[in-house]
Amino acid sequence: MKIILMLLPILFSSQFIAAAEIDRIWLTHKTNDPSKIVVNWMSDEPGDSVVHFGLSVEYGETVRIDDETTIHHVEIPLKHRDTSYHYSVSTGEQRSADATFKAYPTDILRVAVVADWQGKPDLSAIVNDDVHLLLTAGDNIARLWDKCGEGEKDCIKPYEELIEEYPKLFRSTPFMPALGNHDREIRPRGSKPPAESAYDVDALAFKRFFELPDDEWKWHFDLTEFDLRLVALDFNHISDFGTTWQTCHAFDENSEQFHWYRKLMKQPHGYVVTLYNERNASVRNQAQKQWHEQFLRGTCCITGFGYFAERAEVDGVPYYNTSLSGKGNQYPDPNSKILADEDSYILLTVKRGGAMSVEIKSLNSTVLDRQIYERR
């Protein structure tokens, strides 16, 4: 009898651990609008992919995919606004605890933009801003090769570690990253171009881990109720293009990327925010300054190129730089209006039918710069 009594707590404890063992969960969008959301997770053992969701812990709706896998991407519909969704995921006998995320609002939308995530700092300031969507301007990890081995293109371990660092943030806030050079560094860069490519231009690991719209290495996302379009471009280390240091897709006037962006900007939304991971002054001069001509149709551009906080302005177009590692060497834009040696992020706040504010904020929540933009 004593043996049975000792075993029962162990059995119950083991069952509880199994029921709550899935904890690497993140939310993304692969549609171009917020009508659906993708629930992503990692499981220790391969199995099916099941999401239970609803407006309460009783859930009420289920989406199941029967493929055997350890990385799971399940898209669920979002029919409601101005509320919170509850959800849990399961793979075989593995379970997650209940989690929640905010449905998109109908009055005021808050979006944060970060970059240069290699240091994994405290993001309490962003959590306190209670954002509806988290974006990046590239460099979401330090590199691939030191965790995965040189030349491994589809290894996702550094991205798993990013999710593990901020479990509550990623399971409660939709996340849409843009690409940087660090996101696809598969070999040491070295002091001169190596014999084999140092970067995976196709970004296989990034695309395997994140479910995003369009080609994933470039994407756009529309929040029509707020007349807002968000666009991620693939610009980084463009001076290395054509060498084994090349990191990004083509960007000349005949490139797929340029034609795609120009088409998006022919009938732009009232607000267009463009993200990338290259020096602003370099990007706007590409294709005989035709990129800048397209940016004139939007609201602002945001890069994570430099380790500093900055707002520049050219022909009325604001060019921002933000970095979570903002105390590095500064490379000011020739048209810089504000430059700060601060770890920072950018907060976009859009009032439905009204203006958009863009704030550069330090990680201690200090507002370094605030601008108001009207619809174009």
Positions of predicted regions on the chain:
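Active-site glycine-centered loops adjacent to acidic/histidine catalytic or metal-binding residues
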Residues: D116, G138-D139, G180-N181, L233, ...
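Short acidic, glycine-rich surface-loop motifs adjacent to enzyme active sites
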Residues: L144, M265-V283
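Bacterial N-terminal signal peptides
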Residues: L5-Q15
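Acidic, histidine-bearing metal-coordination/catalytic regions of metal-dependent phosphoesterases
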Residues: A18-V113, W117-Q118, T349-R376
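Residue-level marker for buried hydrophobic side chains located in beta-strands
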Residues: V111-V113, L134-T136, P177-A178, T274, ...
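Extended active-site neighborhood of metal-dependent phosphoesterases/phosphodiesterases
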Residues: S84-S96, T100, P105, C148-R262, ...
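Acidic-and-aromatic substrate-binding clefts and catalytic sites of carbohydrate-active enzymes
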Residues: W117-P121, L212, N280-N285
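An acidic-aromatic substrate-binding cleft motif
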Residues: S96-C148, E152
